[in-house]
Amino acid sequence: MEDLETRCASLRTEIAAAEAQLTKLKRELHEAEGAALRAQSQKTASANATTGQRTKSKWPLHGEEYRRYGRQMIVPQFGLQGQLKLRDAKVLIVGAGGLGCPAALYLAGAGVGTIGLVDGDTVEASNLHRQVLHRSRNVGKLKVDSAIEYLRELNPHPTYIAHQAHLTPREAPDIFKDYDLILDCTDNPATRYLISDTAVLLGKPLVSASALRTEGQLMVLNNPPQPPGDKTGGPCYRCVFPKPPPANSVTSCADGGILGPVVGTMGVLQASEAIKVLTSAGESVEATPPSLLIFSAYSSPQFRTIKLRSRRPNCAVCSAEATVTLESVRSGSMDYVFFCGTVDPADILSPEERISPSEYGNVDSAGAQRHIIDVREKVQFDICSLENSINIPMSTILASAYSAPTLDADEPKRLPSWLPPEVAHESNKPIYVVCRQGNDSQTVVRKLKELGLDHGGERPVVDIKGGFRSWREQVDPDWPDY
């Protein structure tokens, strides 16, 4: 029996080695074919430059290109002319994450001639479930480098340009000017306004998308890309959202979560819209009114479309009364961070109202009587929780209407519906509050004190600093890092 198991293990090892070698050979073949194609093009160009003559090819594409792109070229709405337009196109993708990865993947596969990627982040393990260009071995590598490595293996023909930094107002105009179309694949309002403003001022159409949890949105903006003041141009991001959302209402994927197929769907739709814009260049787009596409994975139907108005007559960027200029963008006088606002980490409690995770770990080890309240949402509480902790989600606390509890023994007890009676009445037990990162828990500590649960300071109501992120660092290294 042991001999058979050993033989099976040996065969699996040999098969894995053979598959790895085959993959390596296929990659080398693709690279060699791409190099040969580029060398032939350079040789022809050099010969033409030397003789002063232009050699006319029988066909507008190389043979390998017909084989690679043939299935999309026989689509009636696309055809040979569509392929030629893609080959000559230059697309800039801002953000090499959940949206940018699938968008870049399909645009590279379709044969877009030049693809630029802008991102200053590095690959993290938490990216891999949705950012499909990055692989486990590239954790820690710059995202643009990781993405281009994958794209070159997929299709060596396009030119790939890496912009290895976050987009800034000073650099944005100089980067954008060399491209025909911009894709906004970012996840924060300040960058979205910067991208839209720069695209409008440089006359570039923009495909913008977003995704969070199980929902996504998509818009094609500044299409057609007419100068500011021209009412026939497509609306910009400011036309749709003249004012940014309150900074404290903006939820990131890290905080709100995201399903990989949801953001993947939106990225693929961005690529589809980009191809439509690029292949219709020079043609009228009046027949396609601006709209907002909304995707909801758990709804039926999953897709809805909302018609958008044309350019706002008082838009700060694309109207005749525009106040935002390329110079104001470059110089920084248009402060996007100030315009959108920022949320600083919560620091609303005094040092006496907070303890470190390691200090609470000592309390836990000593077996002291206490209440530990976990204010994460239930879905997070179900992933991991401390023994004997009570889950009271922050959203439940904020959404509930209540009157302050009466703790006087001579009056009937009136408690908030979300507060367990034992927490209110077991005044001999201190209350410890914890959350994911140490911000929500501070708010809840303040709320519990407003309700009088600290009995005028006689009963400790304490926040655990840094939440479970710090708990993992200081107490339990095996705590799930999600």
UniProtKB/Swiss-Prot annotation:
Name of this protein: Adenylyltransferase and sulfurtransferase uba4
Keyword match Nucleotidyltransferase: yes
Binding site for Zn(2+): C236, C239, C315, C318
Highest classification ranks of the organism: Eukaryota, Fungi, Dikarya, Ascomycota, Pezizomycotina
Pathway(s) where this gene product acts: tRNA modification; 5-methoxycarbonylmethyl-2-thiouridine-tRNA biosynthesis; Cofactor biosynthesis; molybdopterin biosynthesis
Cellular-component GO terms for this entry: cytoplasm; cytosol
Region (Disordered) location: 33-57
Domain Rhodanese residue range list: 366-480
Chief site of localization: cytoplasm
Record note on cofactor: Binds 1 zinc ion per subunit.
Entry superkingdom: Eukaryota
Keyword RNA-binding: no
